Swiss-Prot record:
Single GO cellular component term: extracellular region
InterPro entries named among the record's database cross-references: Di-copper_centre_dom_sf (IPR008922), Hemocyanin/hexamerin (IPR013788), Hemocyanin/hexamerin_mid_dom (IPR000896), Hemocyanin_C (IPR005203), Hemocyanin_C_sf (IPR037020), Hemocyanin_N (IPR005204), Hemocyanin_N_sf (IPR036697), Ig_E-set (IPR014756)
The name this protein goes by in its record: Sex-specific storage-protein 1
Leader sequence segment: 1-15
Record field: transmembrane: none
Positions bearing carbohydrate: N494, N706
Source organism of this protein record: Bombyx mori
Keyword vocabulary terms for this entry: Glycoprotein, Secreted, Signal, Storage protein
Amino acid sequence: MRVLVLLACLAAASASAISGGYGTMVFTKEPMVNLDMKMKELCIMKLLDHILQPTMFEDIKEIAKEYNIEKSCDKYMNVDVVKQFMEMYKMGMLPRGETFVHTNELQMEEAVKVFRVLYYAKDFDVFMRTACWMRERINGGMFVYAFTAACFHRTDCKGLYLPAPYEIYPYFFVDSHVISKAFMMKMTKAAKDPVLWKYYGITVTDDNLVVIDWRKGVRRSLSQNDVMSYFMEDVDLNTYMYYLHMNYPFWMTDDAYGINKERRGEIMMYANQQLLARMRLERLSHKMCDVKPMMWNEPLETGYWPKIRLPSGDEMPVRQNNMVVATKDNLKMKQMMDDVEMMIREGILTGKIERRDGTVISLKKSEDIENLARLVLGGLEIVGDDAKVIHLTNLMKKMLSYGQYNMDKYTYVPTSLDMYTTCLRDPVFWMIMKRVCNIFTVFKNMLPKYTREQFSFPGVKVEKITTDELVTFVDEYDMDISNAMYLDATEMQNKTSDMTFMARMRRLNHHPFQVSIDVMSDKTVDAVVRIFLGPKYDCMGRLMSVNDKRLDMFELDSFMYKLVNGKNTIVRSSMDMQGFIPEYLSTRRVMESEMMPSGDGQTMVKDWWCKSRNGFPQRLMLPLGTIGGLEMQMYVIVSPVRTGMLLPTLDMTMMKDRCACRWSSCISTMPLGYPFDRPIDMASFFTSNMKFADVMIYRKDLGMSNTSKTVDTSEMVMMKDDLTYLDSDMLVKRTYKDVMMMSSMMN
C-alpha cells in the first residue's frame, strides 16, 4: 500500500510540474534577451522534450516556421559558418530517424557545422530561435549533440540546467527489454494484466505512473567481465564520460572557443587514467586482475552484448568472443592507426614531433604533456583541417566497429564503442584506454624522477589519518524514460504524455564518511592537500609496492587549506570532496523547483551547475568491497602551493570562470596525478608531509540494504553478488533471506 501511495504522489507531482511548466509560452515574437534563469531553463527543457518527434509546443512551432536563418546572417558573429551550414543543409543532411554516430566522420562534420551556427549566435534570443528552427528540421540526435555542446560553451548559458542525457535520449542508457516493456504498456494503455506485470516486474499506479524493474530480464553473459556490468553500465558514469567529451570535444581545435587556454589535454589524459584506476579498484572487489592493454594482432577474447536498442529499431551489434581484429576489411584503418601511434611514440623518444605544416611540437618538458594529450585524445590537429583531426582513440574504436558493413553513408548501425554515451559499457573500451594511457606512461617515464625537495614540505608533518567505517550498499533509483516513448495525436494536442515511464535500477552507493587528518606545522602557510585511495594487495593477494600501484591510486580529493602554527585537524566529508556530484537532478524535480515563486530552485540549480559539468558520480567514490572487508590504503600528502610549471599559453583564471577546475588543476601547477604520475625513487619518497593508512571497505549484507526502505523489493529475483549478473535461477522467486543463505553456502 505504501508503495502505491508513494508512486501516486510522484505521478501527481510530475504531472503538475509538466503541465504547469511546459505549458508556459516562453518563446515569443519579442526579443528573448533579458530572460531570467528560470525562463532560459524552461526554453532548454521544452526544446529537448521528446526529441525523436516534432515538438508539441505551439510557441516552438511558430518560431521554427517564421524564423529564417539564411536571411538573418547579420545576427551571427561569424557569417561564414551560417553560409557553410546552409550549403550543407540544402545538399542534404543526416535524415531524421537515423542514429547519429559520434565516430562517423561525415555525421560529425555535419554536427560541427550545426554547433558553430548555434555557438556564433549574437545573443540568447538568436540562439533560441536558431535552435527552434533546427529542432524541427535536422536529425534529433545530431541536434541534441550540437545543442548540448553549444550550451556547454556559450557564456550566456553559464549556470543553466541541462536535462541529463539519459532522460533526453534513454535508448543509449537502458536495456532493450525495458524499452520494449514500456512500449507494450504504452500501446495497451496499461491494460490490467496482473500475471504479466508481476512476471515483468511492472508496477502501475492509478495516475498512470509505470515503473519497470530493470532487473527482470534475461542477462546475456559472454565473458567474466559481465560481472562488472553494474559499474560499466552505470548511467551516471556514462554521463560523466559524455560530459567529459562535451567539455573538450576532440574537434574543437580553434582558439576562438577559448578552451585551448585551459589544461584540456592534461585533464582529459588524467580523467582517462583515473577511470582506469577506479576500474582497477572495482575489479579487486571481485578478485579480478588488472585490465590488459588492447593488442591488435591477437584474437579478441572478450565479447560483448550491448543490450541496446536504437530508436530506429535496430539492435547494437553483438561482438562474439575470440573475434579476429585485423582483417582485410580494416587493413587501411589499421595501417593508419599504427602509423599515427608509431609517430607519437617516436616523438616521445626523440623529444619532438614535426607536423605537416612544418611546426614542431616539443615533448621534452613536464608541461609538454598538454600538447601530447591533445595529439592523442583530440584538440590539436596533425593536419590543417580541424574537421579531420587524426584522433588516435577514435581510430582505435573504429577498428572494432562494423563500419565496413554500413554501405550507405547514413544507415550506419553503431557499436557500443562508437558512442560516448555507451563506450564505457564495453570491456574492450577499457583495454583501448589502457593502451592509450600507456603512451602517456612512456612520456612520464622519460621525465626525471621527483626529488626529495619536490616531495617534501619543510616544517609540515602528517601525524594521523582516520576515517569513518567505509560501507557500500546497493540502492534503488527510478530513471525517467518517458522521452523514449512516442506521443499520439491526443497527447500532442494536450501537450503532455498520458503516462510517465520509469526504469527501476539497482546501483552501487556508499554511506557518507569523513576523513580526519592531523597535521603539525611550524608556520602559518597555504597548502594543497591531496587524498588518494589505492590497493594494498593485488588480485593474487601479493603486497604491492608504491611503484606497482602508483597508477592505480584514485584521487578522492584535492583542496587548498591554510595551515596554522601548531596542530591542525583537517576534516573532510565525502559529501564535500572536490570533483564529485551527488546526483544528477531529474527534469521533473527541476520543473517543480522552477515553479517556486521564491526562486529556491534557481539557487539550488546554480549551486549544482559546476559539479554537473565536471563531477564524477559521488556514489561510485568507493569500490564495492566485500562483506568481510576489502583492505585498501588511503594516502594523504600536504604540499606547498607551486606555480610556474605550465605552458605560458594556459590561463587558470579562465578555467575558474568556466568552472573547468578538476582535481588540483586550478590550485597548483604541479602535474595532475602528482606524486604518482612518474616512477618514484623510494629513497626520496617517504617524507614527513605524507602518510599511508590502511582502510577496510565493507559491503553491506544484502538483507540489510533495504530494511529502511518503504518500497518492498523482497520478492525481486536476486543472485549471489546482489547486482545485475543473473544466474540460471533467475525465474525462481526467492526472498532476500533465501538468497543470502544460498550465497553464504556458496562462499
